[in-house]
């Protein structure tokens, strides 16, 4: 039987009012708390008027559980009463609705009518540190700003529809070294989204001192709501405050905030990146939101494998925001070009430049294309382009953070770095406060059955139908009511339904206005971004009980086990229609389409929200519509991305696909890696495209052509070279060599550091050293031990040599380059017959294989090893022992979701029906 719960669904209107904050006050961009006066300050940016600061107050509060056993005030009721009187404490019993986890959780609310400091002191005087180890699950006190927003039901950015309406200032420094102790700032660029632009130059330390002071004066004059840089947390702010110290500037005096008695703080903080956490130093200036824009890109990169780098140059190109005349300067040349002020020819159409001494009269030969300028001017143009791109990247990637901050009762700085489970935690804490509810006892984290990820056909497949369920896990929760019992009012279900309905509405509006009003369409598209984050993070929060008090591993496992059953149901249905399943991953399956699929017809009956009654569906869409009508109820629905020309499945979670527009997507370390040598990346880009086009013969010819280039040392050094970043000073590196590993061995040598020592380089942290292996055997590593000493099988490349001639060729280790190359090609051979697999790869092009057209045909279903490909029955369709064990514990039939299907559905699965 299907589980039944009797909570009434909370209306979307109630949820919307709660999320947006019931208090109507608009234009709050920041909240500050003054500990000395126990006062809240609201910083507002009023359109047309500028900044305004208003004082307010609130009653601070704490959720507490059973403090017995903690010797609170030595268990003396008299002492507790005296302390309550002293600190203005009132205690309220919270509602639990008889729920066991709520009864065992934080069941009291403690408030201080005297202030936040007094609330904290009440606990400390009683011997309980609110943030101590023994009280961490007994006392919950939020920061004052979050308490204020929750208790007053206010939200940031109310009244602003778009991120661009808020005044944003970005800045960037140009320095002549990587560390403040080794150099100075010679240029500061400042730009806002409201048209302000300024470059402050400084030729010496005296001018540098003035430039830093002027930088803070500009901030004070403009009073932006948001201050951002790109990698500013690790670089720019560190430089500014270190140079202040070195130059003898009192940073607290020149950094003017919006409060005369407060300046800035710098504290260790954490950036949450999907399943990882990264440390950084948060700079905070009173009254402002200070962010590092790279954090938003890094967070996007953690969940989007298509983003290969978080570098500004790359990410601007990725979002198609690069200006055609963008000027680029290698970071190692910026200081030199600025200092020497040599003359250059600048191509104003594409941003490229050449030394004036090497070319004559380019402005006359190409009027309107070239102008003569100087190195320092190029640096200024480069800086301005950097700032413009920083604003564009901020607009693109922080739009979601801005909209999240308008719903989550916390600071913008925190929203920009917090994990998704914490988003739900903040919402549920606010809901519990509003409805006088206890906070549930936390559950422990346990192992449970995850999603179904299988590979059924390795190799090459054509006419690939890509199907995935629309928001599978959230839809399962809504349709089958899979929510924790401790959410006694049904808030999580109400919010999830609101988010889902609202996102669909925004997506439909974005599509509706796409042709007639691009700006309005983009606005609706942006509005659905944060909602997508909420929807997709619900399952993660539910499965993270150590963070999210309402987490429930039992419910999380029901979601994944039900998801597996829906995946099996979908596979059975489409196999009955002649499709062949290729690969599946949690919420979707790729199928190879049958012959004659274009003749499939189905008239929709409107039994699912994705199917229009009376509409005739053709081809694969007919089968998707029929499946939706028969099996999908409520929010559940199957989506199609259409039929894609081809795909190559190399291994589990390693594949290449070509979409209907010819765009190729690569997934997995077999064919995509940040550490891939450029010459191999270049080959794979073209080679994989040939294979996806089904042209095995051309791929084989291209392999031998490219192998010949590698063999004859005709590959440019820029593509063969390794790029290593300096992460240790030379002094620290030398110290490292004197230490031993845990096994008692000497520490390994680093080729780039050995080259720096050998060439007497004065390297800085962050410098990139390019070098080429020139050994004579494949086994020759970059550095080899020989007796007590070492042998360097590599040489260094000067970056300016490659700038002058990017196609420069030279000496490199051919056997090693070929071995590395062939290792990357081998996984691709899964698309070929055995004859090609056995005879294609050689280490000398003279020994190439010859293959017939028939032998070059691409295939699928033939793995290298037996375990490389899953079996349909045993590995996919059969329910695992772990799943059966869960369903037995739960008291549910594993096929309970079929209860919602249309009557007589059994015949629609043919031989694959489950009962």
Where in the sequence are the language-model features?
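Active-site-proximal helix-loop-helix substrate-binding element of RNase H-like nuclease domains
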Residues: 200-202, 206, 223, 227, ...
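Short glycine-rich phosphate-binding loop at a beta-alpha junction
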Residues: 225-232, 579-585, 590-592
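Common nucleic-acid-contacting/processivity interface regions adjacent to the catalytic cores
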Residues: 5-14, 18, 333-480, 518-573, ...
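DnaQ-like (DEDDh/DEDDy) 3′-5′ exonuclease domain used for proofreading
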Residues: 4-223, 249, 372, 385-408, ...
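C-terminal, non-catalytic extensions of nucleic-acid polymerases
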Residues: 597-915
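Cytochrome P450 catalytic domain signature, combining two hallmark sequence patches
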Residues: 248-255, 481-490, 604
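Short amphipathic alpha-helix segments
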Residues: 73-84, 560-577
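Short active-site loop/helix that positions an aromatic residue
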Residues: 235-246, 470-484
């Amino acid at each position: 039987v299907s589980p039944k719960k009797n909570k009434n669904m909370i209306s979307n209107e109630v949820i919307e009012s709660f999320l947006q904050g019931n208090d109507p006050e608009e234009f709050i961009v920041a909240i500050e708390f003054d500990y000395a006066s126990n006062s809240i300050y609201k910083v507002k940016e009023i359109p047309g008027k500028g900044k305004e600061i208003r004082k307010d107050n609130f009653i601070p509060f704490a959720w507490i559980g059973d403090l017995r056993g903690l010797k609170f005030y030595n268990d003396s009721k008299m002492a507790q009463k005296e302390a309550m009187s002293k600190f203005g404490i009132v205690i309220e019993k919270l509602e639990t609705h008889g729920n066991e986890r709520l009864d065992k959780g934080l069941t009291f609310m403690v408030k201080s009518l005297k202030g936040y400091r007094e609330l904290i002191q009440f606990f400390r005087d009683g011997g309980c540190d609110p943030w101590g180890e023994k009280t961490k699950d007994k006392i919950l006190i939020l920061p004052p700003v979050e308490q204020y927003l929750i208790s007053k039901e206010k939200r940031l950015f109310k009244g602003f529809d778009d991120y661009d309406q808020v005044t944003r200032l970005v800045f960037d420094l140009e320095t002549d070294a990587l560390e403040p102790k080794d150099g100075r700032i010679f240029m500061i660029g400042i730009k806002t989204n409201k048209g302000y632009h300024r470059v402050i130059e400084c030729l010496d330390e005296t001018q540098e001192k003035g430039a830093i002071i002027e930088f803070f004066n500009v901030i004070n004059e403009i009073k932006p709501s948001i201050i951002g840089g790109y990698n500013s947390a690790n670089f720019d702010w560190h430089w500014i405050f270190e140079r202040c110290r070195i130059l003898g500037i009192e940073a607290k005096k020149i950094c003017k905030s919006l409060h005369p008695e407060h300046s800035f703080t710098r504290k260790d903080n954490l950036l949450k990146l999907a399943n990882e956490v990264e440390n950084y130093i948060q700079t905070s200036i009173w009254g402002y939101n200070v962010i590092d824009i790279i954090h938003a890109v890094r967070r996007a990169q953690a969940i989007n494998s298509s983003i290969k780098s978080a570098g500004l140059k790359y990410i601007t190109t990725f979002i198609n925001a690069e200006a055609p005349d963008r000027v680029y300067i290698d970071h190692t040349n910026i200081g030199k070009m600025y200092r020497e002020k040599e003359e250059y020819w600048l191509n104003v159409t594409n941003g490229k430049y050449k030394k004036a001494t090497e070319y004559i009269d380019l402005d006359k030969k190409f009027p309107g294309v070239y102008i003569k300028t100087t190195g320092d001017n190029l640096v200024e143009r480069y800086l301005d382009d950097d700032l413009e791109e920083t604003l564009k990247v901020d607009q693109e990637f922080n739009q979601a953070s801005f909209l999240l901050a308008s719903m989550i009762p916390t600071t913008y700085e925190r929203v920009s770095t917090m994990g998704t489970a914490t988003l739900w935690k903040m919402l549920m804490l606010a809901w519990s406060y509003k409805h006088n509810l206890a906070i549930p006892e936390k559950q422990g984290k346990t192992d449970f059955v995850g999603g179904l990820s299988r590979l059924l056909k390795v190799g090459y497949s054509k006419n690939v139908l890509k199907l995935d369920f629309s928001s599978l896990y959230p839809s399962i929760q809504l349709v089958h009511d899979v929510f924790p019992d401790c959410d006694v009012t049904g808030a999580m279900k109400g919010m999830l339904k609101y988010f889902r309905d609202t996102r669909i509405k925004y997506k439909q509006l974005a599509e509706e206005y796409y042709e007639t009003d691009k700006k309005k369409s983009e606005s609706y598209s942006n509005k659905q971004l944060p909602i997508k984050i909420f929807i997709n993070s619900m399952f993660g929060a539910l499965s993270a009980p150590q963070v999210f008090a309402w987490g429930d591993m039992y419910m999380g496992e029901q979601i994944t086990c039900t998801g597996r059953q829906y995946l099996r149901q979908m596979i059975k249905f489409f196999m009955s229609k002649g499709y062949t399943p290729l690969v599946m991953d949690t919420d979707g399956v790729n199928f190879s389409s049958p012959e004659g699929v274009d003749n499939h017809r189905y008239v929709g009956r409107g039994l699912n929200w994705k199917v229009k009654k009376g509409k005739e569906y053709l081809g694969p869409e007919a089968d998707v519509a029929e499946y939706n009508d028969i099996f999908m109820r409520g929010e559940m629905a199957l989506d199609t991305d259409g039929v894609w020309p081809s795909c190559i499945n190399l291994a589990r979670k390693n594949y290449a696909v070509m979409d209907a527009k010819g765009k190729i997507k690569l997934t997995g370390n077999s064919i995509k890696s940040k550490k891939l040598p450029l010459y191999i990346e270049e080959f794979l880009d073209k080679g994989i495209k040939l294979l996806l086009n089904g042209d095995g013969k051309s791929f084989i010819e291209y392999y031998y052509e490219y192998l010949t280039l590698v063999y004859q040392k005709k590959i440019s050094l820029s593509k063969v070279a390794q790029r290593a970043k300096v992460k240790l000073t030379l002094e620290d590196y030398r110290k490292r060599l004197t230490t031993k590993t845990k096994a008692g061995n000497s520490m390994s040598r680093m080729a780039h550091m050995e080259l720096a020592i050998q060439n007497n380089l004065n390297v800085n942290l962050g410098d990139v050293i390019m070098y080429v292996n020139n050994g004579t055997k494949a086994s020759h590593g970059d550095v080899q031990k020989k007796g007590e000493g070492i042998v360097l099988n590599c040489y260094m490349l000067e970056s300016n040599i490659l700038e002058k001639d990017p196609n420069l060729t030279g000496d490199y280790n051919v056997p090693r380059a070929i071995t590395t190359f062939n290792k990357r090609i081998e996984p691709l051979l899964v698309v070929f017959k055995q004859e090609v697999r056995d005879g294609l790869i050689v280490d000398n092009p003279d020994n190439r294989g010859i293959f017939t057209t028939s032998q070059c045909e691409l295939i699928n279903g033939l793995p290298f090893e037996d375990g490389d490909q899953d079996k349909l029955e045993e590995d996919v369709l059969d329910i695992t022992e772990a799943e059966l064990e869960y369903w037995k514990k739960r008291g549910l039939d594993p096929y309970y979701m079929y209860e919602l299907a249309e009557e007589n559905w059994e015949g629609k699965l043919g031989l694959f029906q489950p009962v």
